[in-house]
Amino acid sequence: MADLLPEHPEFLWANPEPKKSYDVVIVGGGGHGLATAYYLAKNHGITNVAVLEKGWLAGGNMARNTTIIRSNYLWDESAGIYEKSLKLWEQLPEELDYDFLFSQRGVLNLAHTLGDVRESIRRVEANKFNGVDAEWLTPEQVKEVCPIINIGDDIRYPVMGATYQPRAGIAKHDHVAWAFARKANEMGVDIIQNCEVTGFLKDGEKVTGVKTTRGTIHAGKVALAGAGHSSVLAELAGFELPIQSHPLQALVSELFEPVHPTVVMSNHIHVYVSQAHKGELVMGAGIDTYNGYGQRGAFHVIEEQMAAAVELFPIFARAHVLRTWGGIVDTTMDALPIISKTPIQNLYVNCGWGTGGFKGTPGAGFTLAHTIANDEAHALNAPFSLERFETGHLIDEHGAAAVAH
């Protein structure tokens, strides 16, 4: 019987005691931190690396997202990094030698108003210019892709069409983290759990290490990949980040036979739904409007999301919700990430992904690793510098991002 069970994730990597010093310390053991460690080792030959996680590996937003992967963003800069990320997703199962159930089942982004229609068609054309696969579908074509959706005109927000990205899809989030962790461990990276960073060692305006609950660790370079707690880490280091953290809720239903063949998203009414490989419906809601670090949210957000979901999918009316939870999303004013050097020498930051963090996992790791190794940004993340908030060179991606998952 034991031979039939999946390998316990802790057997996939070592759990060493932290060494006194490393070339690079990455704060945050989620998808982005692990991907950064992997690409540092693979692309740049830097293996004397520690990934520090204050809890268990990938127990933060990596364990709490709705697993949607897409790249159909409006502006050139965001389309560039998300399309790079999607191309990396497509090769990672073979590269990491781990089946994390990447399913390119397509993503529909619904339009409910004439304004939605105009913006959606604009985005489809922009995607085509950037080499991103995108189509505009009529309501009847939407019904062909997703037969269970209600395209009647007698609901509050009738479906007037949708954008469709066939290469988009979902993946098993826990397995993604385990795959990166296993491969990084094989390359010599130390993955250290239950090790919270409580402060930074500095020599003037240069970081030289971190203080943790498991002792002091010296480092040549330090990277922050703490998602919703990035502003807290930055404050400990002595600078500010222009981000706000909000709870973002999601929920799952009981198990069903396969009924939902794709991923459906509606920014207008904040319904984001797919069916996981085991059969449960995975649904995302809108963010709670208040700032906070709690991993749960207000019930009315879920209530409104469920009402809208049942209108779009009448078949869900008798489904039972098993559990709800929340993650902490760190949002910037232009709805795009910060992957950048900081005012502190040898300290780098990757944050501000908002609700796009999971889909950007490989791209974030790829570009942050390049930035750390070369002390300068890759062309893909150069537009996402911290300085853009001083110069005013923002990239307003709210039309394609907002709180979309």
Swiss-Prot record:
Belongs to the SoxB family. GO terms for molecular function: nucleotide binding; sarcosine oxidase activity. It comes from Arthrobacter sp. The modification Tele-8alpha-FMN histidine is found at residue 173. Keywords: Cytoplasm, FAD, Flavoprotein, FMN, Nucleotide-binding, Oxidoreductase. It catalyses: sarcosine + (6S)-5,6,7,8-tetrahydrofolate + O2 = (6R)-5,10-methylene-5,6,7,8-tetrahydrofolate + glycine + H2O2; sarcosine + O2 + H2O = formaldehyde + glycine + H2O2. This is Sarcosine oxidase subunit beta. Its main location: cytoplasm. Disulfide bonds: none annotated. Signal peptide: none annotated. Binds 1 FAD per subunit. Binds 1 FMN covalently. GO terms for biological process: tetrahydrofolate metabolic process. GO terms for cellular component: cytoplasm. Its cofactor is FAD; FMN. Its EC number is 1.5.3.24. It is found in: Cytoplasm.
